[in-house]
């Protein structure tokens, strides 16, 4: 695939982590991509980070913002999709650091009729604090460094850092929705349009990504495994409020029991607004 890729990075009031994410993306070996920051209501610190990176990046950077009205991950991702120009979208969380071959590997794995679900290594709270405070480029660490951190309890596992040529084994879980998360998920734009993107009835933490994956299955799109190829380093963060999880699970169960393809309230319902991120104070 040679088309432009859109990397849609969701964030909320975590400017130091976003700075590290943009640093990692700036070092990609494949530079034929754009970055869309999908901002779920952050304050001026986030806008300042984005402004500081805009002239330094060798690829376009856009900032899409919506008012803070609680966790609205589905809606802000739809706004990110709407602002994107690529024919292939990679969703990445604003605290996930991509290794230098992340874009190149996703491009190589891209295939018509398939989406790619990657995985992650979780960093501990202490190691995350050190990475951010000392501006450590942890996305460049080799397996030896990661192994030392594993022995110290700094990371939870090593396997996502390995690169293995799995070939046809990447398709053996083609109908499994579990474990496919928007911290590392790649979907063709035409498939997002067919499914109408994320369902914004999902609010609060949880399962809006699973809902999308199930509807992709209903549309005939299958899952390709990005493990041992596209792993990212996921910085620690406190557990999100899960008070809406029960309602979100009920919505997901309904989709699982149906053959519905399109979101109940999705990408096509997004209306362009004049929402602007908070001004950066000079």
What does each of the following model-derived ranges do?
Residues 3-6, 34, 211:
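Cell-envelope/extracellular polymer assembly enzymes that use nucleotide-activated donors
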């Amino acid at each position: 695939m040679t088309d432009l890729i859109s990397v849609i990075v969701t964030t909320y009031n975590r400017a130091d982590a976003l700075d590290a994410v943009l640093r990692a993306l700036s070092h990609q070996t494949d530079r034929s991509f754009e970055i869309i920051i999908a901002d779920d209501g952050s304050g001026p610190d986030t806008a300042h980070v984005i402004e500081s990176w805009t002239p330094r990046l060798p690829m376009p950077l856009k900032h899409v913002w919506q008012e803070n009205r609680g966790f609205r991950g589905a809606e802000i991702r739809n706004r990110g999709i709407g602002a994107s120009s690529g024919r292939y979208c990679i969703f990445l969380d604003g605290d996930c650091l991509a290794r230098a071959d992340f874009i190149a590997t996703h491009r190589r794995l891209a295939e018509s009729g398939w989406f790619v679900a990657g995985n992650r290594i979780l960093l501990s709270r202490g190691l995350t604090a050190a990475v951010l405070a000392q501006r450590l480029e942890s996305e460049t660490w080799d397996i030896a460094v990661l192994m030392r951190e594993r022995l110290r309890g700094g990371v939870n596992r090593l396997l996502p850092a390995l690169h293995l040529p799995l070939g046809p084994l990447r398709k053996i879980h083609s109908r499994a929705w579990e474990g496919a998360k928007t911290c590392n998920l790649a979907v063709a734009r035409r498939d997002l349009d067919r499914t109408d993107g994320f369902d914004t009835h999902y609010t609060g933490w949880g399962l809006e990504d699973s809902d999308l994956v199930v509807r992709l299955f209903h549309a005939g799109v299958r899952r390709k495994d990005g493990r041992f190829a596209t792993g990212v380093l996921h910085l620690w963060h406190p557990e999100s409020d899960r008070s809406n999880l029960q309602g979100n699970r009920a919505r997901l169960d309904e989709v699982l029991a149906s053959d519905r393809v399109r979101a109940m309230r999705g990408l096509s319902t997004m209306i362009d607004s004049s929402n602007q991120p908070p001004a950066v104070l000079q």
